[in-house]
Amino acid sequence: MVGGTFDPLHDGHKRLISRSFALAGADGQVVIGLTTDTFASRKVHPIRTFDERKTDLVNYIRKNAFTTSYYIEPLNDRFGSAADAEFDAIVVSEETLPTAVEINRLRKEKGKRKVDIHQISCVLAEDGRWISSTRIYKGEIDIHGHVLH
């Protein structure tokens, strides 16, 4: 399982998604939680629609010919179905690790087994700082981390 707003879909997101597919393997399934328009509206910068962001995800998955089955579910809050669903692992970045820890705490409270947390390193831009959607929207970097000014 992996989740986010994925707008714009940058190299950090791509690493997260690729790792999710690699962990699931050919016989597994990847669940991608994609923030709804309402939940994403809390961001300080403009966000494209759910459908536009979903199309970008599907195109990235197809382009990379991932063979693992996947499902994109609407994410209405930080946890989505992760506190209740049956799954084995969640893939997070350094930035979203606290959410995964909280998910496992909630699962324990509900009598569910904890899931494995796989943390990836955030992808760094040319300037050594994390690639982030906020930095891209501010015009500091592009989706590959190239400094724009």
Q: Where are the language model's segments positioned?
A:
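Nucleotidyltransferase catalytic core that binds NTPs
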Residues: 1-149
